[in-house]
A protein has these predicted regions:
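Short secondary-structure capping/turn micro-motifs that flank functional sites
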Residues: 149, 254-255, 272-273
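Secondary-structure boundary/capping residues
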Residues: 138, 186, 243, 264-265
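Short, surface-exposed, charged/polar-biased interaction segments
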Residues: 53, 124, 172-175, 179, ...
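A conserved beta-strand-loop-helix scaffold within acyl/acetyltransferase catalytic domains
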Residues: 1-45, 85-102, 109-223
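Non-catalytic surface loops within mature trypsin-like serine protease
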Residues: 107-109, 273
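Conserved catalytic-core motifs of GNAT/GCN5-like acyltransferases
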Residues: 98-102, 263-273
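Acyl-donor binding region in acyl/amide transferases
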Residues: 4-5, 37-97, 207-263
């Protein structure tokens, strides 16, 4: 199915990505292709705070026996992945728990259709926010880059944020994002204006669509919604490029729904062998 493809084509299932996020696993963990073994438990590679989707794991009884595995604890799985895991006859007990929610936006062929698909209230709100932005900003341009200069802007906007968001960009996290940007198909979309770069979106773009992994904004401009304005421009650009989806990934921030996103339930799986 399309959803299945969207999850399995996401960056989070790719070898070079898993190679990068394994640093978040325990030092003692034994890392395999798409899972790790921690003690006697099969777990995911990479912390769920950083990894939005998971590869579908194919585990055979040999793995269990050779590594004296007695449990499987996996997170952030899609429904189709749970179904596949449950076809295994070896399990003693299974617990499936609703966990994170991701938000996804399917894109039509025309931007006009996208606007029509929004609820009347959301369409009205979007227009109001765009007018407010244009009233304050004389010129703007949507650009994309893998350059250090824009990466530094992304990082410093994070560090200047208030509250939790300001604490997010530690030295390790910064190094992780810097390495991520070096991988194929990762880039930063940014909104360049006569008043500087007001917002950025750290994305992975595939042939079929775009995954919004993280974002930042210049807090001086919060009152004119630079994030919404940027996302709207990205949506227009993706539609022009013929992309099928804009995946907002994990987290239920309101703006994702305001822009027409639909929630996608993810699950955690606890298995005893």
């Amino acid at each position: 199915s399309f959803v299945e493809k969207q999850v399995l084509d996401s960056p989070f299932t790719k070898k070079e990505y898993l190679n990068l996020v394994k640093q978040f696993n325990d030092r003692q963990d034994e890392i395999f292709d798409d899972f790790a073994i921690s003690g006697n438990t099969i777990v995911n590679i990479g912390n769920r705070e950083f990894v939005d989707y998971r590869p579908t794991i194919d585990i055979n009884s040999e793995t269990f026996i050779n590594n004296s595995v007695s449990k499987i604890n996996l997170d952030s799985l899609h429904y189709f992945q749970i179904k596949k895991m449950l076809q295994n006859e070896l399990f003693k007990s299974i617990v499936i728990k609703k966990s994170d929610i991701a938000v996804n936006l399917m894109l039509p062929d025309l931007y006009e259709d996208y606007l029509q698909n929004l609820t009347k209230k959301n369409r009205h709100e979007l227009n109001r926010k765009k007018r407010k932005f244009s009233d304050q900003i004389d010129s703007f341009e949507l650009l994309e880059s893998k350059e250090k200069e824009i990466f530094d802007t992304f990082v410093s906007q994070h560090k200047k944020s208030k509250g939790e968001k300001g604490k997010f960009m530690t030295k390790d996290t910064e190094a992780y994002f810097e390495n991520l940007l070096k991988l194929d198909d990762w880039k930063i979309y940014y909104l360049k204006t006569n008043k500087g770069v007001v917002s950025t979106a750290f994305c992975y773009e595939s042939k079929k669509g775009c995954y919004l992994y993280n974002s930042s904004r210049d807090n001086k401009f919060n009152s004119i919604n630079p994030g919404i304005f940027l996302n709207d421009l990205i949506i227009q650009r993706l539609i022009q490029k013929g992309k099928c989806f804009f995946d907002f990934l994990k987290g239920t921030e309101r703006y994702k729904f305001d822009l027409g996103g639909q929630s996608v339930q993810l699950y955690d799986l606890y298995i005893k062998l």
